[in-house]
Regions:
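Long, acidic, intrinsically disordered low-complexity segments
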Residues: 1-21
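Mg2+-dependent prenyl diphosphate-binding active-site environment of isoprenoid biosynthetic enzymes
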Residues: 14, 18, 24, 28-215
């Protein structure tokens, strides 16, 4: 008999496999080569899929109807959006490697990486819209809010590099937007699509912020 821990690992492994399947098979087009080649390279970069799995868990926490297959498209959308942030972050940091592979800006160039990141945003929205459950509009609103705040966080990060001192409060605000917000949003979007009540969303938001801060 499997232990509870083993069952949990197997379940999370299944979620990751399903998310991977959607993400790695997302781009069918081959031309323009300079757009789809690097973008496919990003989508095939792997990862733990933490944000995608959190969306599924957020859905499961509030829904008593089991897993709706459409939630995997929302999970994939969050992972693709996360990839966008990494691609653009690598441009801003002049990074040469990520996840044991060259970054797009290193393998190609910064302009190509910029364009690939832009495409990933579009693909993320496209994937989320495939999760056309009754609360999809509210999920899209939350998704967009998270994207804006992630960009704000990245901007604060660059601004703080030019400051002599940064307060703890300022730093915590920056990391909440840059890193924590998408973690929080992953739980919220899953829960929203599962028809969460306001008090459930409030609790998950608080929990998501704590996870995000830990990152």
């Amino acid at each position: 008999m499997e232990t509870k821990e083993k069952q949990k690992d197997t379940k999370f492994g299944y979620y990751k496999k399903e998310i991977d399947k959607i993400i790695t098979g997302y781009i069918k087009k081959k031309e323009p080569v300079l757009l789809y080649g690097p973008s496919r390279f990003a989508l095939e970069s792997g990862g733990k899929r933490i944000r995608g799995i959190l969306a599924i868990l957020g859905y499961k926490i509030v829904s008593n109807k089991g897993i709706n297959r459409k939630i995997f498209f929302a999970s994939s959308a969050l992972e693709i959006l996360h990839l966008f942030t990494l691609v653009h972050d690598d441009i801003m940091d002049n990074a040469d490697s990520r996840r044991g592979r060259p970054t797009i800006r290193k393998k190609w160039d910064s302009n190509t990486a910029l364009l690939s990141g832009d495409l990933l945003v579009g693909l993320a929205y496209e994937s989320l819209m495939k999760a056309d459950l009754p609360q999809i509009k509210n999920a899209l609103i939350e998704f967009n809010k998270a994207l804006i705040e992630v960009c704000e966080g990245q901007a604060y990060d660059k601004e703080f590099e030019e400051k002599d001192t940064v307060s703890i409060k300022e730093y915590e605000m920056m990391i909440q937007k840059k890193t924590g917000r998408l973690i929080e949003s992953s739980l919220l979007i899953g829960a929203i699509l599962g028809n969460a009540k306001p008090k459930e969303l409030k609790a998950l938001s608080r929990y998501g912020k704590m996870i995000g801060r830990a990152f």
